[in-house]
Amino acid sequence: MESIFKQGLDEDDYEVIIVNDGTKDRSMEVIEDIIAAHANITVINQENLSLSVARNNGIAAAKGEYILMPDSDDLLIENSLKPLLDKALETKADLVVADFLEMGDEQIAQSTDLQNSGEATFVEKTGKQLFLEDLNPRQCYVWRTLYRRAFITGKKLTFVPGIRYQDVPFTHEAYLKAGKCMRTHWLLNIYRRGHESAATASFNKKKAHDLCIAIAKTWRLRKMKKLPLSVRQKLDDDIFVSFSLLIYFMLYSVKDFSDREEIFNFLRKRVPKLKFTHGVKQRVTSMMYRFMPHVYFFFRLVFKWVTSKPNFG
């Protein structure tokens, strides 16, 4: 939270909207002194409606020309935002996409004076160029991007209420619908790393359904008019990445075959024509998902067992 106010910006020129999603911990108490010290902070309280609803409500309340959506547990690098905002205001770009660092808690604690060096440089691209050249489907992070508010509202971009993985369809839709964009390797955020194993361990049917909904909404983007073939192919490949993530989580965290079947049926109802055709791996996976899901999981379990056996040779 404090890193937001270390950006070299005049507080009269921007607003900070805090959406309290019915937190049960002491988060709001911890930042009471920060709220009291800054007149440009607005607090919105909601009853545990999910991060996606919190973001939608924050966007609806925003008045500024550009919107940044940092996560509460991540950090902005000191004085990293102003060059991006200046370029955004100068070019009226729909999106300004920056780079970030991944660090663990111990690394963050030891990095007391982390800043960019030199000047930020930018490359102008269209949204579809950005999609093809820069979007990693495993890193659909909305907090690394400045969004022009009129672009979000004009294109009716919203986060799917009540689900996790909402960044995936939102980021894909934003890139595909954007006009002028600016890309920079300037570092904006520090992404707090270290909870990946916990995410796998806590995966359950609700999260599986959420991922299915995210896959379904991303799949519907294929209906956009005049998508170049290269864009359509990458979109299909990106959806396959999300589908593979679903399979991985189900394999390691959903043990009951009836639960796995229910999740697949849930996905089939939302994407009846889900099919992947780029390469042998996609074709085989797609065929087994559609016609032999139990056999597919059996082979995946055997492969998991074989590759995890200790080598005594």
Where in the sequence are the language-model features?
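Short, acidic, metal-binding catalytic loop of nucleotide-sugar glycosyltransferases
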Residues: 2-13
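A conserved acidic beta->alpha catalytic loop
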Residues: 3, 20-30
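Conserved donor nucleotide-binding strand/loop of the catalytic core
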Residues: 14, 28-63
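Donor-binding/catalytic cores of nucleotide-activated saccharide
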Residues: 51, 72-184, 191-203
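Short aromatic/hydrophobic "clamp" motif used to bind/position activated sugar donors
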Residues: 67
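Catalytic core of nucleotide-sugar-dependent glycosyltransferases
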Residues: 186-195, 201-229, 245-274
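Amphipathic alpha-helical repeat scaffolds of TPR domains
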Residues: 236-248
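Membrane-interface aromatic/basic loop that binds lipid-linked glycans or pyrophosphate carriers
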Residues: 252-313
